[in-house]
Amino acid sequence: MPGPTPSGTNVGSSGRSPSKAVAARAAGSTVRQRKNASCGTRSAGRTTSAGTGGMWRFYTEDSPGLKVGPVPVLVMSLLFIASVFMLHIWGKYTRS
């Protein structure tokens, strides 16, 4: 039988049926949580300040692109919804 997989499960590698494998595992073994060595180093290399970039550049003044406030976005979305609604009504009456 091959060594343990990284996830701690042996999917398809055992000759036993899945119900017997689960019963054998649940009967005498304890559940172990895998320790990931890169988990601590991954967050240490990442900076989370607002001015450095990433997702937060979307909300700052130095983000590239068109600056649109929340009120025009709300108005445009409501106009889009109204136009789709009107097209549905127009299509319903022109088809019949």
Swiss-Prot record:
Region of interest (Disordered), ranges: 1-54
Keywords in alphabetical order: Acetylation, Endoplasmic reticulum, Lipoprotein, Membrane, Palmitate, Phosphoprotein, Protein transport, Translocation, Transmembrane, Transmembrane helix, Transport
Cellular compartments annotated: Endoplasmic reticulum membrane
Lumenal side: 92-96
Modified-residue entries (Phosphoserine), positions: 7, 13-14, 17
Principal location class: endoplasmic reticulum
Membrane side Cytoplasmic: residue ranges: 2-70
Stated consequence of mutating residue 39 to S: Abolishes S-acylation
Residues where N-acetylproline is found: 2
Biased composition, class Low complexity, residue ranges: 40-50
GO biological process, alphabetically ordered: ERAD pathway; post-translational protein targeting to membrane, translocation; retrograde protein transport, ER to cytosol; SRP-dependent cotranslational protein targeting to membrane, translocation
Lipid sites, type S-palmitoyl cysteine: 39
Chain ranges passing through the membrane: 71-91
GO cellular component: cytosol; endoplasmic reticulum; endoplasmic reticulum membrane; endoplasmic reticulum quality control compartment; endoplasmic reticulum Sec complex; membrane; Sec61 translocon complex
Phosphothreonine PTM sites in chain numbering: 9
UniProt membrane topology term: Single-pass membrane protein
Compositional bias of kind Polar residues: 1-17
Molecular function via GO: epidermal growth factor binding; guanyl-nucleotide exchange factor activity; ribosome binding; RNA binding
Free-text function comment from the UniProt entry: Component of SEC61 channel-forming translocon complex that mediates transport of signal peptide-containing precursor polypeptides across the endoplasmic reticulum (ER). Forms a ribosome receptor and a gated pore in the ER membrane, both functions required for cotranslational translocation of nascent polypeptides.
Family label: Belongs to the SEC61-beta family.
Disease listed for this protein: Loss-of-function SEC61B variations may cause autosomal dominant polycystic liver disease (PCLD) in patients that lack variations in known causative genes, such as PRKCSH and SEC63.
The protein's assembly and partners: The SEC61 channel-forming translocon complex consists of channel-forming core components SEC61A1, SEC61B and SEC61G and different auxiliary components such as SEC62 and SEC63. The SEC61 channel associates with the multi-pass translocon (MPT) complex. Interacts with TRAM1.
Name under which the protein is recorded: Protein transport protein Sec61 subunit beta
